[in-house]
C-alpha cells in the first residue's frame, strides 16, 4: 500500500469518459477475462472455493 497515489491525484471520470473505458470482466472468484483470453488469480480462486465449501455451495459474492 505504500506505493499508492494520494486520492487527490486521481481524476474522477464522468459518464461520457467512463463509456470510453475498455476493460475485461471480473467474475468474483479469481477469474478475469478480456478479449484475448482469461487469467486466474489462484490464491483468490482457492479462497473462493474454500468459502463455497464452507457455506454449502453458496458463493460469497
Swiss-Prot record:
Chief location: secreted
The organism's place on the tree of life at top rank: Bacteria
Keywords of this entry: Antibiotic, Antimicrobial, Bacteriocin, Disulfide bond, Plasmid, Secreted
Residues that make up the propeptide removed upon maturation: 1-24
General function of this protein: Inhibits a wide spectrum of lactic acid bacteria.
Example GO biological process: killing of cells of another organism
Protein name, entry field: Bacteriocin leucocin-A
GO cellular component: extracellular region
Family: Belongs to the bacteriocin class IIA/YGNGV family.
UniProt cross-references to InterPro entries, sorted A to Z: Bacteriocin_IIa, Bacteriocin_IIa_CS, Bacteriocin_IIa_dom_sf
Subcellular location: Secreted
Disulfide bridge partners, by residue number: 33-38
